[in-house]
Each structure stands twice: as structure tokens, then as C-alpha cells.
């Protein structure tokens, strides 16, 4: 087990700067080349990392500036996967996402040109002299599985190449393990698995809408646990692996509701990660009680500061809530963060860059008061 001894943290995505948004629009319109876009990405990532360090963050990311989505870009980077469109996107509260998806077109495998590996290599190249930990966030294996069976067309595509789900789950786990080990070989010591599957499966209405049929929660939970843990077998001891369990974060809206209780006995008690990043920024998130299932010694990062709204939480309220959480998990194994990233997709949440950094400052300053 590898630990992070800093009690303030981030989830990882940041609002895309205007220059980057314009470059992506120009690339989509075929006004600039892929190399031109990459130059803008490189420069904006350099600026972001400098801001992260100046803010006092000890764990930094590239803001996911090269991605359109928090999850699909990673999926498209695996061998055997193609970029497709569905009739609908994901249904959020009062809003629907774009309708991109990922579909099987062959056996799934990791390849050495995966975009997340290339992204990390660049991040490392600009931070070699810095006293910070570099994090690479990737969507979880369970999230990949959920996308590949989302809707009848995706399911039909899977069946062309996989005769049973065991084989599919095994290939997903192996592709992910290969990606994680490649990141490690490139110098990464902090990998975070972003995972909406657990946050969605607690909400009967959401998942039934997405799959257009009923579902067996217990069966899904077993599959999610199996495919995630399958990717985490025999990893290096000095690699910290965490997971962020989300209920959806798109343009300041949410997708699912419900506390972590129904999934705690699986994900908290049995998933082989070092830390859990959990959303607790509103009443939809439920109580702290389920975190008692997290084994002693593992970290729980409390997402008490919302990334969806610009209004700043009161430090005293945050301190009170951390103390409440400490009734269920040791205070020294707790930390504070925003509830999610600021831009899980390139659209971003509805706040300004200045407001984003004020949120980060609030997290850091409050954590320093609690864990002085």
C-alpha cells in the first residue's frame, strides 16, 4: 500500500482555457492540424501545472486538457475499440450529454501508443525538477465494461468478438493492468480510477433508464468488483492507486442520487485500492455511515467542496463535517477535496477559472486548519 500524507487534494480535471477551447474548435473545423492543436495543449498544460504548484498543491495533473470526455478518450485509445455515436447520450438532471460512445470492433488490448501514456510522459517532462507527485487519472475498468454494454448496438458488437462475459471482463482487466504498468514504467506513482458505476448503481431510476430494462444490482456489483480488482493484481508496492466514485458531473449537473450504503460491502470493503475519493457535497450523497466499511489504514478523501457551483462553502461548516466523518473513519486517514473535477468534459462546469482557484484555496486552507 502506498500512501499520500497530504490532507488536501483534487480530483483532477480543470476548466479548459479559452485558448484551448478555440484550438479544439479550429481543429474540429479542420482549420488547424493535429500538431497545431498539440502545441496549444502543451502550452496550456504548462501554464496549468505552474498554477497548481503556485496554489500549493502537492499532487498535480494535466487538467485532462487533451480529453473531450473524462472516460471515452481513454476507451478509444485501446486496441479493439472504435468511436461511435448512440441515439442518446447520458441523461443528467435537466440535461443530456453528447451522444458519443465506445464499441468493440475486435479483441480488447493495450497498445503502446495509448493517449493516456503519451499524456503522462509529457506531464513528467515538464515537472522533472518539481517537488510534486504526478497523477494520471483514468476511467475505471468497470466504467469501460458499462460503456461496452450500454445499449443494444454495443451489446451486439461485444457478442461478435466475445462468446461470454468472463472473457470480456478478463480482457478489460488485462488491458488496464498493462496500461497501469506502462504508466508506472514511465514514472507514474499515482493512478486514480474515476468510476461512476458505483454511484449510478445505487440509483434504481438512473440505471434502469440507461439500460432500458431492469437490472440485478448484486450481479452488477460483483462484475464491477471483479473487473476492477482484476486490473490491480500484483502492482508495484510504491504505486498509489485510488478511486473516485462519482454520481455524474456534466456542465454543473448530476446524473444519479443515493448514498453509498448499497455498494459499501463491495467497493469499500473489497476493492483493492489505497484511497477512496467520495462525493459528500449535498444531501443526494447520503450520510457518512457507509465509510465505516473502508478498512483501517486506507484513506478516505471527503469531497465536501462542490465543483459545480461558484459559491464558497464556509470553513467552519467543512470542519464540522470532517469531524462528523471522523466518527466512522480515523481522522488521520481522512482528507479534504472538491467533490469532483471542474470539467469532466470539455464543456466544463458553470463557474469561472478564478472561482475554480478560490475553491482550491478553500480546500487547502481548511485542511491546514484541521490537520495542523
Residue ranges: model-predicted function:
Residues 1-372:
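Domain-level signal for soluble alpha/beta catalytic cores
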